Amino acid sequence: MSVTTKDVAYIAELARLKFTDAEQEKMASELNMILHYIEKLNGIDTEGVEPLSTIHDQINVLRADVEHTPLSNDEALKNAPDSQDRFFKVPKVIG
């Protein structure tokens, strides 16, 4: 399987991204390198190798939960660039 610049252009259109021709060439090359690596991984014999659920033998290494008072809405919105009706106001991102 090989990724062409046409494939990159199609995927970019779906994601609403714009690439120059040079960027499309580079992206196609990088995606082809990734696919080549995956093909190498698929060729590895893993017969008899037990799957890992984790790479560490340690369990419960997360921090302990500590109860604390959360920020009030006013405190949280104090640093917001824009707010409306006690909510963060952000620019529209979907057409």
Swiss-Prot record:
Biological process terms in GO annotation: glutaminyl-tRNAGln biosynthesis via transamidation; regulation of translational fidelity; translation
Alphabetical UniProt keywords: ATP-binding, Ligase, Nucleotide-binding, Protein biosynthesis
Entry EC no(s): 6.3.5.-
Highest taxon, organism lineage: Bacteria
Catalytic reaction list: L-glutamyl-tRNA(Gln) + L-glutamine + ATP + H2O = L-glutaminyl-tRNA(Gln) + L-glutamate + ADP + phosphate + H(+); L-aspartyl-tRNA(Asn) + L-glutamine + ATP + H2O = L-asparaginyl-tRNA(Asn) + L-glutamate + ADP + phosphate + 2 H(+)
GO molecular function, one term: asparaginyl-tRNA synthase (glutamine-hydrolyzing) activity
Subunit record text: Heterotrimer of A, B and C subunits.
Family classification: Belongs to the GatC family.
Record's function text: Allows the formation of correctly charged Asn-tRNA(Asn) or Gln-tRNA(Gln) through the transamidation of misacylated Asp-tRNA(Asn) or Glu-tRNA(Gln) in organisms which lack either or both of asparaginyl-tRNA or glutaminyl-tRNA synthetases. The reaction takes place in the presence of glutamine and ATP through an activated phospho-Asp-tRNA(Asn) or phospho-Glu-tRNA(Gln).
NCBIfam families, sorted: gatC
Protein's UniProt name: Aspartyl/glutamyl-tRNA(Asn/Gln) amidotransferase subunit C
Species assigned in the record: Chlorobaculum tepidum (strain ATCC 49652 / DSM 12025 / NBRC 103806 / TLS) (Chlorobium tepidum)
